[in-house]
Amino acid sequence: WDETFADDGTTIYGNAGGAWTAFKSGGGDDELSAATLVDIRANIVHATSTSAHYADLAERYATDTSVEAGDVVMLGGSEEVTKCNDDLSDAVFGVVSDSPAFLMNATAGNNESHPMIALKGRVFVKVKGTGQAGDRIVSGGNGEARIATLDECTTFNTLGRLIKHKYNEETALTECVIGVK
């Protein structure tokens, strides 16, 4: 709430119960500036977004271990998700995201107790090994992914695909698309 806001006579209020309020400062009809913008504050906004700055769909899940962006997780452990420590895990679930385009279950916990788990879309993943754009990734243990051979891939263990070539063997955050087999 902006405590410095003062009613200059051009303020328009809606629903005194507090469901929404619109503020508008004065200015000419053709004047575009910060002073003429409308600031809407609401309890619930029903709107349609036509674009997003980021490219993954994520949801908050309770975790039983410390995780960070790019970590591969699986369902299970003592909470909902845990870091995936198995190679070629059929329980692989998603990747910890730091900037999802859309976040579901947003009010559940915080990033330590309920990290944002990317379920689909473009996200940076901790990948070890070299690979070409389009190569499939699977869990590689220690919360990392690795490049899979075609004979290793199944519907259950494939996490996604590399978007760009990866030229070094070291584990690095690598742009991938997940949820694509």
Residue ranges and their predicted role:
Residues 1-56:
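Small/polar residue-rich beta-strand/coil "junction" motifs that cap repeat-based extracellular fibers
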Residues 29, 37-181:
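Extracellular receptor-binding modules and their adjoining Ser/Thr/Gly/Asp/Asn-rich linkers
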